[in-house]
Amino acid sequence: VEAAGKASGWGGVTAHNRAQVLYFLAENLSQRADEFAAALSATGASPKPALEVDATIRRAFWYAAQADKFDGRVTATKTKHVTMTVNEPFGTMGLIAPDEAPLLSLMSLILPAIAMGNRVVAVASQSHPLIAARLYQVFETSDIPAGVVNLLTGERDALGKTLAEHDDVAALWYCGSAEGAAMMETASAGNLKPVWADAGHVRDWLDPAQGQGVEYLRRATQVKTIWLPYGA
C-alpha cells in the first residue's frame, strides 16, 4: 500500500497516455502468449490455457481502447446551466482475485482499475499464485510506473481483510465466498470504503459480458458533478 501511495502521479497522467501504456502492455502480453499458455498448462491452472491467454490479451487491448473514453460528460439542463460530470480515480484500490482463470480474472480486475488512473494492490489466485510472478515481468517492461501495480500472494481472506481495514486503500473489489464478502464489508465499515463483491457468485471470466465492460470502469471511478450557469 505504501508503494502504491508513492505512485500517485499515475492519476495525473492523461487518459490518452494511459491508453498508450496499456496498448504497450497488451503487445507485450501478446509476444509472450505461448509462455503464459505453457505455464497455465504445466500447473493445471486452466482447462483451456491458450483460450485464457488469448482472452487476456484481447481484454488488455479493449481496456486500452477505453482508457480515454470514460472521462465524463457535459449535459444541458432545463435551466440555464450545464452539468459537467467527471469520473475521477479513487487512488489506491485493493483487488482480491478468485481461483478461477487465474491469469484472466486477475487481469480483468487490474486493467480497468489502472485504465482509470488508480494504483492497485492485487491479491492473486490463492490456488495458483505463480502466474503473478510472470505478470510482474510484463508490467515492469511495459512503461507502467513502479508502484502502480503491486501483486501479493497468500491467503485471500486474510489479505483482503487487511486491505479492507487499511485507511489508505480507497476502494475494494472482492471475488470470493459469500462469507468472505461479508467479512470485507464489515472490515471496511469503519473507513466507509466502497466494496464491490461477488459474494460467492462464480463468474465465467471468458465471457466478455461477465468479465469486462463499462461496469468495471464505472466501479473504478468516483463521480464529481459540477453545475455551471450561463447566459443572462
PLM features: what roles do these ranges have?
Residues 80, 87-96, 142-232:
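Conserved NAD(P)+-binding/catalytic subdomain of aldehyde/semialdehyde dehydrogenases
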Residues 65, 70-145:
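Conserved small-residue-rich beta-alpha loop and adjacent elements
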Residues 60, 132-135, 163, 184:
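Hydrophobic packing residues within well-ordered alpha-helices of enzyme cores
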Residues 28, 57, 64, 138, ...:
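Alpha-helical structural signal in soluble globular domains
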Residues 31, 35, 101, 129-130, ...:
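Short alpha-helical
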